[in-house]
Amino acid sequence: MKKQWEPPELEEMQVVILSLHQKWWQKMAAGEKVLELRKTKPQCKAPFRVLVYVTGGAGVLGEFICPEVLEIKNFEEAEKKSKVPAHDIHNYAAGSRNKVYGWEVADVKEYPRAVTLEELGIKR
């Protein structure tokens, strides 16, 4: 059963901003992409909220909850959840001392309109 976070829990969560290309955000928002691959993991503990900034000046288009960050060892399994081909994950890992982390994606929310970084109090 999927975990549902209540407003008090959401308010207490750390917030991370993640920059994504439009195509990956669309797959995430559609529920197809349930794992985001990164060479790093946040300093904060999971679960945490992730604001999704879409590159190209689109702004923050939504958010999700990351219930857990996993070290990826099986690239074929990660391919299914991330929609990134296993050979691309292998190449990506080669540039990061072979460590790739999978940020689990849950409770995706699309905003009705793009929010600018400035509206969030963030200066570029």
Label every PLM stretch briefly:
Residues 2-124:
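Structured alpha/beta reader/binder surfaces that contact nucleic acids or chromatin modification marks
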